[in-house]
Amino acid sequence: MASLCLSSSRIVSLHHQKPFLSLKLRSRPSDLSGLGRHTSPVCFNPLRLSGDRQRTATVSTRVEKRRKRGSSVVCYAAPISANSLQWISTISCLALMLARGTGIHKSVVVPLFALHAPSSIVAWIKGEYGVWAAFLALIARLFFTFPGELELPFIALLLVIVAPYQVMNIRGKQEGAIIAIAISGFLAFQHFSRAGSLEKAYEKGSVLATVAIIGVTVVSLLLLL
């Protein structure tokens, strides 16, 4: 009977151990199956890696080009407008009227001023303020003596006021540009011929008149083109 008890106890122990072993063996595949569900296989593709590198290099090249374009200095020379040229000629004419180191006939500068004066100045002279300025200057001229340099601006003021429409209409046209070139060429010939030489024309007393005559001549040529 003892042997039977021993054998039965062994059988019972073996019976109790089998489920424990079977549970351990079954738990491992379940863990592996869980890992298979939550993880994905990692594959190395060299072609995909090279394509990503090429895209990165292309993007960096574009960014560098944009930076270079943004930081580069762009030089652009805008053409001078006709209004700016008229202002240059007007200032040059006034400088010739007031300059002393020249032997030109300054009265010839007055029609050149009327031809090249900007439209804003002509409108101001022909307006109420210009008429009052001419009236007061004329009253002062009756009682006082003006120097020769100050008489020429006053004469130019009166010339613009009393000039008829047909004469002022040639301003800005080819006819007016041809007349202006003829006047400026005559003034340049007088100035440089009476100065004696180019060195004397650029001396301290004549440099202002020389620069003004060059400016008037160049502006007249540019307005004709």
Swiss-Prot record:
InterPro entries registered for this protein in UniProt: COR413 (IPR008892)
Membrane-crossing segments per the record: 78-98, 103-123, 129-149, 152-172, 176-196, 205-225
Stromal side: 77, 124-128, 173-175
GO CC, alphabetical: chloroplast; chloroplast envelope; chloroplast inner membrane; chloroplast thylakoid membrane
Stimuli inducing this protein: Accumulates in response to abscisic acid (ABA), cold, freezing and drought treatments.
One BP term from GO: cold acclimation
Keyword vocabulary terms for this entry: Chloroplast, Membrane, Plastid, Plastid inner membrane, Transit peptide, Transmembrane, Transmembrane helix
Primary location: plastid
Chloroplast intermembrane side: 99-102, 150-151, 197-204
Membrane topology: Multi-pass membrane protein
Organism for this UniProt entry: Arabidopsis thaliana
Cell compartments where the protein resides: Plastid, Chloroplast inner membrane
Transit peptide, residues from-to: 1-76
Family: Belongs to the Cold-regulated 413 protein family.
The keyword Hydrolase appears for this protein: no
Transferase as UniProt keyword: no
Name this polypeptide is given: Cold-regulated 413 inner membrane protein 1, chloroplastic
Pfam families the UniProt entry points to: WCOR413
